[in-house]
Amino acid sequence: MSSETGLGTRLRATSGMGDGIEGAQMLGQHQPALPQPQATVMNNPDPPEITRPNQPKRQTNQLQYLLKAVLKTLWKHQFAWPFQLPVDVVKLNLPDYHKIIKTPMDMGTIKKRLENHYYWNAQECIQDFNTMFTNCYIYNKPGDDIVLMAEALEKLFLQKISEMPQEETELTVVQSKGRGRGRKEQDASITPMRTRVLSGSLEDKSTVKPPVTPVSKPSTPTPPTVTRAPTPPQTRPQQGRPPAIAQAPIRFSPTISQDVVVPTTVAPTLVPPPLSNHPAVIHTAAQPAKTKKGVKRKADTTTPTTHDPLHESSPLPSDPKPPRAVPRKENGRQIRPTKKTEVPDSQLPAPPVLHPQPAPNAERDTKTSEQLRYCASIIREMFSKKHQAYAWPFYKPVDVEALGLHDYCEIIKHPMDLGTIKVKMENRDYKEAQEFASDVRLMFSNCYKYNPPDHEVVIMARKLQDVFEMRFAKMPDEPEEAPAPVPSLAPGPPAPSIKGPPPTSSDSSSDSTSDSESSSDSEEERAQRLAELQEQLKAVHEQLAALSQPQPNKPKKKEREKRKEKHKRKEEVEEPRKGRIREPPAKKPKKSVQGSGGTPSIKKEAPPPAPRPARPAPPSAPCESSEEETQRCRPMSYEEKRQLSLDINKLPGEKLGRVVHIIQSREPSLKNSNPDEIEIDFETLKPSTLRELERYVTSCLRKKRKSQDKIEAPTSGTVKVKGYSSSESESSSESSTSDSEESDSETAPNQKKKGHSGRESRKHHHPMQQPLAAQLPVMKPPSPTIAPSYPLPSSLDSSHISLHHPLHPANVFDAVMQLPPDLPPHLTGQTEHCSPPHLNQHALTSPPALHNAMPQQPSRPSNRAAALPTKPAMPPSASPPPPAPQPPQQPHVHHHHHHHAQPPHVLLEDDEPPSPLTGLPPYLQPLQKSQQPPTQSPIHSLLTSVKVQSQTPMAAPPQSMRHLQPLVYPPPPSTATTAPPPASSHIHQLQSSPVVPQQLPAGQAPPPPQQQQQHPALQGTLVSSHQQHVQHQHAKQQQVIQHHHHHPSPRQQKQETYPGGHLRDAPSPLLLHSPPVPPYPGLTHPPSPQSVQPKKQEIRGASVLQPQPVVMKEDKRHSPSIRPEGFSPGMRPEPQKVPEVLKGPSHIQPRPDLKKMDGGRPIRLPDQSLPPQGMPEKEKQKQEPKTPVAPKKDIKIKNMGSWAGLMQKPPVTPTSAGKSTSDSFELFRRQAREKEERERALKLQAEQAERVRREQDRMSRTREDDEVQDQARKAHEEARRRQEQQQQQQHVQSNLPTAPSPAQSSQPMMDQREMARKREQERRRRQAMAPSIDMNFQSELMEIFEQNLFS
């Protein structure tokens, strides 16, 4: 670091800032400054020169970059403060500094030199920077704080230098110097003599008392009126460092315009030579303060002062006041209070803004006040709880008495604390921010000086100083940054810095300043203007980003209403003026356009909707030009915005892209936002944008209504519900994917209010895959029409109401009301599910149950499962409990489950194109279609055939039989049953219907749904075995139906043998109350008969199915004319027919475990459900757990009677086709059983072989162990014998006492014997344990058992 000091031999005990003090004192090297400058022997040398009067001024692009980019950045750095002033060796007590450092340098000097065009090229300036850093490294120790700060600054400096322009080009030199931007160059030529005289006189005075007269650039030649400032200058120390001193105490009367006070006694010869280059004139209002950052006012370095800045609060002698207090008045300028001193420009420390254009004095005042306000905020922050943990020791002055610090006052000459600083700030004793910073740094320096470095107070001080320096470095540097950024790019404050009126006191000087500026500062002005515009643009972007942020807390309803009214009034007033461009009012509802799956969806946080019956219809057609313009800009009411949000939520995903485009094209603030996710506040959108959105949404919804009307026209039938074709439904469902998720919960209340008007219901049905609802007459029969007498089963609850119309459950009742009265309401729910398989392939997710015992749910604008792709089916074991709500099904179902009561030929016409069985005869297609849908299509087809008989007399009997076919002959299903099966309550309702006069006995009430879920894996097998029994039953009872069904017997058999697909979707009794089990992925296209699970489970299913003692009694009484039970197709075995069915398979014929129950019904007892002969005990155990499922079979079997009665309605035409079909089924079942038997036999053989192999291995291992042990034993015995022989020989040979030697020889024998004994014990233990525990065998056995149990 360098030292720039006062003039001549004057002692400079006053350093402008505490920067240098602190920088050195933090190192612990410094002693307290001497308060009396005369007492010190040290003196500061002359400061480095900052001007070259004999050399022409030169400006280059690199020098300009160094000033405006490099130096400005370094000056604002938090570690820059020790380097902003020359090292004051007097204040810091560094007597050897100038012996070690021969070329002092500091950033203040470099800054002045750059402003005065001192350097000829950039290399000279860079050399000065390097000198400054090198001085710091030479004088200070490597680990010192000041060295670390210098390294940080140097790193930043080198980084900035690397960005400097490579080629240096000369620029035109701006004649007006940094201080006198408003002055012409000739002013400088007029004033030098007076300047010298003044500075000389001041120097003369300064030897007696510390004058506070700064030296500045030449000022305008005005008569030297000597006027003392009304306020005392005591607290204003003057120093020669540019950024150093706060010149607060010297206040100049703002009413005086003259700028120079020259005592007549001053001899000009006293001025040192540098003064000619930098004349020390008391600066008046004629010289504007530079609008620079950091330090507010730049003090003249040429005028020495003996006043210690640490004593700023102490009064100074008032004698020096007259020479420097030059009151002035600026024409036309508002007079500020005296506390905001109009200090001559030369007294101001160099501000950190590095461009030479100064701002007017008015701006200087503004800037000063802004920075002081910022300083006050720093003080407040340091007093806050946030920093209280380490700032509390500095809140109050050091209490020397209480703490016993008797030497404190001797070491610390100028105590300081935050409390004192705060008081001074409140009393406005600080005139510039640098004074405040000096006091704060003095406080820290005192702490570092008095306390040892490892003291906890020092650690706390360092923490607090870090906070202070960080905040202080961020202090606003220019007034133009203070005002909030506005879109207009010409804010008031920046203008003066670009091309402001000259701050001179006279109009002529003002004119000359503006002329010189306009001629010379073009380059700098352009650069500065560009920087300012960029900053403003950045601020505008930040403001827009803040505005576009979602409102953290939604305002209360009353406030929203008030704001709405205020907004309306304001818009009415502003409408004629603003036209289309209108500023939106405060935020109210939020709408976020958010992409789901790449397609933007719009989410609206709608406030509680105001009650209103329906939204006002949007403008139907544009008016004439002016009227249209007015309409386009007409502000939207709150209700219209809310309705628009609801309508946007109804749009399909592909339309939302256009919505985003409209918003982005009309709202500049959102132009660059991500289209996949846009957060929009409706209140921030212009009325024209909202109107355009309204027109677009209305047109989209109108098109959708028209397309729905067209599609409805061709459909016919008793229920006026249109059925979409597959392609239409696919597209419409896909189009409405993204908006369903978000709007479901939020818009439910809104639609609930509107759900009772036909127009509103259409509105809501449109966007959400409910085109059918537009054609449904919304007759609202009360829910009790179904609820009291026919409790809706879970399947009807979930899939019928929610599938038909998730928005309005009442629409289901509309369809019910249109059905003939002879059908109970649950059948209408069933008919809704009669849809071709291609429509139901996606209906895999369970909709929320809308049980009709519950109140009607609010209408919902979307189906949460709308856009989901087809999901693979889940195994039945994962099925949820029946009462659980089922999520709405896929949108395709919404469009297509509308063939309710149409004649079967109408169904064929609608569904033929996508039907997978186009090759089948037309009369078979309804059958196959009824097999495929995962919803209760068989029941529906039966009902439609019965219902439509009068309408289609010729085709009715065959069609009804064909529809019954899936009920009579479903193939053995796998465990995965597809659609939501009809609950048994459906069947009970059939019994209570006019067609079924007889009710179920109480003993046959369906078991609770939980029972049906206990063994979900058995459901398919149970269904299959019952279906087989039913085949025989219907072969005898309903031959006409079977004749029609089995007429195309080869093809029919082929179709029926499919275990997958939807044949087994005929309501299985086991699943009547169970939740819908999603189909396996391949079930929509049935696999071959040999597919997976059915084969394994048929035998078990049949055997488990049969132990039903209680329920089967009832079945024997059923005759073709009696329908005592709901018919569960394919599940009710007729008691008389089962023996025939069971005779087929060779391994089933013996059946010793079957017994007749009340009428010859073969029932397998629970304890007799054994596998065929040859099965090991494990296989038998595997099937025993399945016997408790018997109650489930009861449900299935008991549902058959009513269906049997319904099937008998067509004329009976006895044929033998039914029997042949049943035989073919029996053959298939027999083959499946045989195959399963073979598989089990093979598995048993493999297990037996594995068991034998393991036993052999075990035996071989034991044999090997025995052999090893025997060999060891033999070897041991041989060794022992040899030893005994040797011992005997030794005994014989010598009569001497050889006791020790036999003992020694016998010892190894004893060890060997002990070892052999242990081995034998281990062998026997293993032998004993071997038959009892074989862990490998046990684990394998458990695996086999588990496989057999769950397979």
Swiss-Prot record:
Positions of the UniProt region annotated as Disordered: 1-23, 35-58, 168-244, 285-368, 478-638, 700-799, 821-1334
- Segments of skewed composition (Basic residues): 554-569, 751-767, 892-902
Task: Give yes or no: UniProt keyword Transcription regulation.
Answer: yes
Source organism (scientific name) = Xenopus laevis (African clawed frog)
Question: Which GO-annotated molecular functions does the record name?
Answer: lysine-acetylated histone binding; p53 binding; transcription cis-regulatory region binding
* Ranges of biased composition (kind: Pro residues): 220-235, 349-359, 482-504, 607-621, 872-890, 968-983, 1075-1089
Q: What is known of its domains?
A: The 2 bromo domains mediate specific binding to acetylated histones. The exact combination of modified histone tails required to recruit brd4 to target genes is still unclear. The first bromo domain has high affinity for acetylated histone H4 tail, whereas the second bromo domain recognizes multiply acetylated marks in histone H3.
> What processes does the entry annotate via GO biological process terms?
chromatin remodeling; positive regulation of canonical NF-kappaB signal transduction; positive regulation of T-helper 17 cell lineage commitment; positive regulation of transcription by RNA polymerase II; positive regulation of transcription elongation by RNA polymerase II; regulation of DNA-templated transcription; regulation of inflammatory response
Instruction: Name the CDD domains for this protein.
Output: Bromo_Brdt_I_like, Bromo_Brdt_II_like
Tell me the protein family, please: Belongs to the BET family.
Q: Which UniProt keywords apply?
A: Bromodomain, Chromatin regulator, Chromosome, Nucleus, Repeat, Transcription, Transcription regulation
Start-end of Low complexity biased regions: 208-219, 505-517, 725-738, 788-799, 994-1003, 1011-1028, 1301-1310
Per its record, how is this protein called by name?
A: Bromodomain-containing protein 4A
Annotated Bromo domain ranges read 58-164, 366-475
